Amino acid sequence: MKFQLTSQYKPTGDQPEAIKALVEGLRSNVPYQTLLGVTGSGKTFTVANVIEQIGKPTLVLSHNKTLAAQLYSEFKNFFPHNSVEYYVSYYDYYQPEAYLPSSNTYIEKDLAVNMELEKLRLAATSALLSGRNDVIVVSSVSCIYGIGNPEDFNKVTIEIKVGQKIDRDVFLRSLVESLYSRNETSEYDHGNFRVKGDTVDIFLAYDDNIIRVIFWDDEIESIESIDSVSLVMLERLESFRIYPANLFVTTKERIFRAVEEIQIDLGKQVEFFQSIGKPLEAKRLYERVTYDVEMIKEVGYCSGIENYSRYFDGRQPGTRPFCLLDFFPEDYLMVIDESHVTVPQIRAMYGGDRSRKTNLVEYGFRLPAAI
C-alpha cells in the first residue's frame, strides 16, 4: 500500500521548493540533508509530503516522549489510511542497576512498566515485520536500546488460515511459545488467551481487538475479529498473522546454547579475578551468575536478563544488541527532529550506559558480555 497524505492544506511559500530538493536528494542517494525552519513554519507537513513521494518505511526520531507524542499525533492525522506507530520507553519509572565504587553502594534495578506503551511498541515492531511499506514509526531515543532478535520474533509468529489442518492443542502450544499466557478468568488482558471447547479467544498483545479461532476437529473452521468491549464480531477473516506477546522472545535451542556459553564465560571471568587477586569479585560473580542460570533453566528468564542478551541473540563479542532499527528493511528513511539536540543526546545516553555497565563488570556484578 502507498502512503496517502490527507490534509486540507497544500504546500505554500518555500515548502514546494524544500519538498522538491529533499526528494531529489533522496533519489540521488544523498546520505544527509537538513531542513531548516522556524517554529510553526510547517516542517512536519513538509516532511510528510517527502514521505508520501519517497514511499519508504520511515523512522521519525525525537529526543523526548512529549515531542514524540506530538509528532505521532500529527503524522496520524496526515496518514489516517497508513500504519503510523509510536515507540518510546515503556517505563513510567526506571532506576537502572548500578554500582558506586566511591561509597561501595550497589543499587538494584527498579522499574514500573506502562502496559499501554508496551502494546504500542509491539504494534510498531509487528507493523514493520508485516511486509508493509507504508509504515511510519515515531520514536524517542528508546529505539537504540536493546530488544529481541527480529529473526526469532519472526520464527515464533503464527500464521493461520481458514481450512488449515492443525490440532487445537498444537495451536495452543504455539501460542505459549509466542509468550501468550492461558487465562480463563480474565475478561480482557493483552497477551492472554482463553479456551472454551473448540473456540480459542486470543487477546492480542499489540491490538485492542480479540481474534477468535474456531476449530472443527483438527481444522480451523473460522477466524473472527471481535470488538473487545461489545464482543460484537467486526469481520470474518480468511487468514491472520499472530505476532509474539513480547519483544524479548527467543527459542528453546537458543536458551540451551546461551546457558552453556554463560557458564563457559563465567568460568573464565572467575579465573581472571582470582589471578589478579580479587577473590571477593570472583565469589560475587560466581554466586550471582549461577543463580541467574538456574532461574533461566527453570522459568526461562531471570532478573536483569538483558545483561545476557548477547548469548540469547547469538551475537559475537563486541557487536551491538538488536534494536528497533533492525526491524526496519534495509532501505528505509530516517528523520531526526531537532537534530542539534537529539544527536548529542544519543551519544550521551550511550556513553552513560557504557560507563555504568563497565563498573558492574569491573566489580564482579556482571559478565563482560553485559557491555
State what each model feature region is.
Residues 1-371:
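ASCE RecA-like P-loop NTPase motor cores
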